[in-house]
Amino acid sequence: MNSLANNNKLSTEDEEIHSARKRGYNEEQNYSEARKKQRDQGLLSQESNDGNIDSALLSEGATLKGTQSQYESGLTSNKDEKGSDDEDASVAEAAVAATVNYTDLIQGQEDSSDAHTSNQTNANGEHKDSLNGERAITPSNEGVKPNTSLEGMTSSPMESTQQSKNDMLIPLAEHDRGPEHQQDDEDNDDADIDLKKDISMQPGRRGRKPTTLATTDEWKKQRKDSHKEVERRRRENINTAINVLSDLLPVRESSKAAILACAAEYIQKLKETDEANIEKWTLQKLLSEQNASQLASANEKLQEELGNAYKEIEYMKRVLRKEGIEYEDMHTHKKQENERKSTRSDNPHEA
């Protein structure tokens, strides 16, 4: 019977401890959700966070202190009945819950400060970005100081043992939340990269002219050297052309002015000679055309006379045929007479 009564008493006490722990956890969860909503809506600014961080930490410390007092009262009442294992388990759970809530609070503060820093950076430029970065660092440091003050206020032996156990469990809690912190760090890095991109894409400030090379000595020297190179090439081209012109002239000159004057005179003479030759060639062409026309008319006359002579020859042939004389016999008779005349001229004594 005693064992049953003790078991019932332990179960009721466990239920009370569990309900108290659940109430504390619900309060802390509601507080963290409210903070996250305020952070998402952008209602918290850097100044309000700087002023309210102490009160938030104090309220968090008061909540933790209340839960610790509930746990201590429950533990002291059940110290004779429950073993050391149950005490260590409840203390460990309370420490883990407190550590998680504190970490969420600090992380929410850092996120809100980062969001405020990005807004101020987009509004004010790169110079204010560095100042906001410093402000983003200071709240996290200020958030640690109230914790030390709260720890100094709790100086009882029971709380010192509780603090030592919490210190032993903090690394375990941080190890359990490692992936979440790693994800938060990656999100912060992505936010920083996006912030840098936004800053780089911002237009330049008005009223500031970009620094050009036109005012530097190096640019002036480079421009002077390029001008000298252009002038040198121009003179080289002129000298080359004058030398070629001097080679074409019949008289060799030394100075450039004499070469140009002689070239102008020589070109003028060539022009006059060309004009004279053109006139001469024109006259010759006209004469040749006239002679060609005369020769053509004479040729036509000769052709006409030859035609008439051919007609007379044909007429004489017909007459001779009528008389019984062949044209060929007459031709041979004339040939024989010519031979006789030639022989008589060669032998005058025989005649």
Curated annotation (Swiss-Prot):
Modification Phosphothreonine occurs at: T138
Q: Which GO terms describe its biological process?
A: cellular response to methionine; chromatin remodeling; chromosome segregation; negative regulation of ceramide biosynthetic process; negative regulation of transcription by RNA polymerase II; positive regulation of inositol biosynthetic process; positive regulation of sulfate assimilation; positive regulation of transcription by RNA polymerase II
In this chain, where does the modification Phosphoserine occur? S45, S48, S84
What domain of life does the UniProt record list for this protein's source? Eukaryota
What segments bear the compositional bias annotation Polar residues? 1-10, 43-52, 65-77, 100-124, 138-164
Alphabetized GO MF terms:
centromeric DNA binding; DNA-binding transcription activator activity, RNA polymerase II-specific; DNA-binding transcription factor activity; DNA-binding transcription repressor activity, RNA polymerase II-specific; protein dimerization activity; RNA polymerase II cis-regulatory region sequence-specific DNA binding; RNA polymerase II-specific DNA-binding transcription factor binding
Q: Which residues carry this modification: N-acetylmethionine?
A: M1
Domain named bHLH is located at 222-270
One Gene Ontology cellular component: chromosome, centromeric region
Q: Where is the region Disordered?
A: 1-164, 196-233, 327-351
Q: Which UniProt keywords apply?
A: Acetylation, Centromere, Chromosome, DNA-binding, Mitochondrion, Nucleus, Phosphoprotein, Transcription, Transcription regulation
- Where does the record say this protein resides? Nucleus; Mitochondrion; Chromosome, Centromere
Function description:
Required for chromosome stability and methionine prototrophy. It is involved in chromosomal segregation. Binds to a highly conserved DNA sequence (5'-RTCACRTG-3'), called CDEI, found in centromeres and in several promoters. DNA-binding activity is enhanced by MET28. Required as an auxiliary factor for transcriptional activation of sulfur metabolism together with MET4 and MET28.
How does the annotation summarize its subunit structure? Binds DNA as a dimer. Associates with MET4 to form a heteromeric complex which also includes MET28.
Beyond the main fields, what else does the record say? Answer: Present with 6890 molecules/cell in log phase SD medium.
Q: What name does the UniProt record give this protein?
A: Centromere-binding protein 1
Q: Which organism is it from?
A: Saccharomyces cerevisiae (strain ATCC 204508 / S288c)
Q: Which gene encodes it?
A: CBF1
